[in-house]
From Swiss-Prot:
The lineage of its organism: Bacteria, Pseudomonadati, Pseudomonadota, Alphaproteobacteria, Hyphomicrobiales. Transmembrane segments: none annotated. Keywords: Bacterial flagellum. The keyword Phosphoprotein does not apply. It is found in: Bacterial flagellum basal body. This is Flagellar basal-body rod protein FlgC. PANTHER family: FLAGELLAR BASAL-BODY ROD PROTEIN FLGC (PTHR30435:SF2), FLAGELLAR PROTEIN (PTHR30435). The basal body constitutes a major portion of the flagellar organelle and consists of four rings (L,P,S, and M) mounted on a central rod. The rod consists of about 26 subunits of FlgG in the distal portion, and FlgB, FlgC and FlgF are thought to build up the proximal portion of the rod with about 6 subunits each. InterPro entries: Flag_bb_rod_N (IPR001444), Flagellar_basal_body_rod_CS (IPR019776), Flg_bb/hook_C_dom (IPR010930), FlgC (IPR006299). PROSITE patterns: FLAGELLA_BB_ROD (PS00588). The keyword Protein biosynthesis does not apply. GO terms for biological process: bacterial-type flagellum-dependent swarming motility.
Length: 139
């Protein structure tokens, strides 16, 4: 497989991985204040994602794949809010272990990586097009 096609495959795998990462971050942000459905029940638990390199046999290129989707087992945040329906008998409410600042940083990083992969695809496509034009002109 030629290097330009390999670059397209690598970038496409990066796009898929970052798209999944953005979805996970979005779910975490959307549920950052979700409490349990009963007093004392556990709230939403932050989701995590990890990536791994996979070698494409046809091209020998290292592709990115989602290795694992998991949950963050860190402690929940606890807040005193006796009026909350999810509050226990002491008025304490368990809140998700989601830190909005971390999620926003993850989102920006994933967005930049997504844009970089898009740019690589565009440049590879342009190079392929220019190569075809040169081959046509030489005939």
């Amino acid at each position: 497989m030629d290097p330009l096609t390999s670059a397209l495959k690598v970038s496409a795998s990066g796009l898929q991985a970052e798209s999944t990462r953005l979805r996970i971050v979005s779910e975490n942000i959307a549920n950052a204040r979700s409490t349990g459905d009963a007093p004392g029940a556990d709230p939403f638990r932050r989701k995590t994602i990890s990536f791994a390199a996979e070698v494409d046999r046809a091209s020998g290129a290292s592709l990115v794949e989602v290795e694992r989707l998991g949950t963050d087992d860190s402690d929940f945040n606890i807040e005193f809010d006796p009026g909350n329906p999810a509050a226990d008998e002491k008025g304490m409410v368990k809140l998700p272990n989601v830190n909005i600042l971390i999620e926003m940083a993850d989102m920006r990083e994933a967005n930049r990586a997504y844009e970089a992969n898009l740019q690589t695809i565009k440049q590879s496509r342009d190079l392929i097009s220019q190569t075809i034009d040169l081959l046509r002109a030489s005939q």
